[in-house]
Amino acid sequence: MNSMSRGYNGSCGKDNRKEEKCPTIIKCGCPSSNTIPAGTTATTTFTLASLTLDTSCICDPSIKLEFASNPILTDFVGTVNIQVFKQCRHQFTPVPVGPVWTLSIATAVTDARTFSFFICDSDSCDHDCCTYTVVATVVGTDTVGTLAINNATLGAIATCRESCKECKKGYDR
């Protein structure tokens, strides 16, 4: 259809659409890599990925966090627990979000695989800025071999719940 066609609307129907009152944020963290060397002792922690998310324009936010990585095992034996933590303004310590995910290898393996999961965080306050961090913790016995966790990436999609449909931040969009 061109501008001379019948029914042409130069505003592309924008006048007929209602403005969306519930913004959505999509944010991706930067990929990173970490190596867990042979002989790493239990309780040793490694930060795999992180991102900071400002939900100040979202009322009653619901956040879906997605983690993906590419573990490379070289004669690796050991167990690593992986968990997401969040730390918001005015909090002194990070708070766990969702369950613990476990990568456990019982016999020496040289392998490449994917490790990914998603969780939802619906326990956030309005008008808050939080940093989400994915932490790996060695558990059980000392590790054997090496585990390289490559391209560890954390992403987030945040939007408001059905009960809240208007941005309360004081600026024009």
Q: What feature does the model see in each segment?
A:
Residues 2-173:
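Extracellular jelly-roll beta-sandwich "head" domains, especially the C-terminal globular C1q domain
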